[in-house]
């Protein structure tokens, strides 16, 4: 579960390394986000020469969480870190590569470009 002020690792090569959650999108009183949800975030650490700079406000989709997600068959998927991919308004990633595994739940959310770029889909 990701909430306001949560710091996430960035799993793409957009230039950001770490982001801080500002808001969870999808309803006025929404507190928590899980895999496949969109957040508004601020870039806290960035690599030099990247597409995004420190202090930029970006949208990101969550691809991995430590708390995990429950699947319809009753199983759970959990990861070692909390990670997100920075996206544009049309749900395409800002970067050209995705690092680490991503959850299958992104496929139902319409993030096919992220799923196709990911090295592993769990």
UniProtKB/Swiss-Prot annotation:
GO CC annotations on file: cytosolic large ribosomal subunit
PROSITE patterns: RIBOSOMAL_L14 (PS00049)
Sorted UniProt keywords: Ribonucleoprotein, Ribosomal protein, RNA-binding, rRNA-binding
Keyword hit for Ribosomal protein: yes
Pfam families named among the record's database cross-references: Ribosomal_L14
Top-rank taxon, per record: Bacteria
InterPro entries reported in the protein's UniProt record: Ribosomal_uL14 (IPR000218), Ribosomal_uL14_bac-type (IPR005745), Ribosomal_uL14_CS (IPR019972), Ribosomal_uL14_sf (IPR036853)
SUPFAM superfamilies: Ribosomal protein L14 (SSF50193)
One biological process term in Gene Ontology: translation
KW NAD (keyword) present: no
GO MF annotation: an example: large ribosomal subunit rRNA binding
Quaternary structure note: Part of the 50S ribosomal subunit. Forms a cluster with proteins L3 and L19. In the 70S ribosome, L14 and L19 interact and together make contacts with the 16S rRNA in bridges B5 and B8.
Purpose of the protein: Binds to 23S rRNA. Forms part of two intersubunit bridges in the 70S ribosome.
Similarity comment text for this entry: Belongs to the universal ribosomal protein uL14 family.
HAMAP family recorded: Ribosomal_uL14
Record protein name field: Large ribosomal subunit protein uL14
Natural source organism: Streptococcus equi subsp. zooepidemicus (strain MGCS10565)
């Amino acid at each position: 579960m990701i909430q306001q002020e949560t710091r996430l690792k960035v799993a793409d090569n957009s230039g950001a390394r770490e982001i801080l959650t500002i808001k969870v999108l999808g309803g006025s009183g929404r507190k928590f986000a899980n895999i496949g949800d969109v957040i508004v975030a601020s870039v806290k650490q960035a690599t030099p020469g990247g597409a995004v700079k420190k202090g930029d406000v970006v949208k990101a989709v969550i691809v991995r969480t430590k708390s995990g997600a429950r699947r319809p068959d009753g199983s759970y998927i959990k990861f070692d870190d909390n990670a997100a991919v920075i996206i544009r308004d049309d749900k395409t990633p800002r970067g050209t590569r995705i690092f680490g595994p991503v959850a299958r739940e992104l496929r139902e959310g319409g993030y096919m470009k992220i799923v196709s770029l990911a090295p592993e889909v769990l």
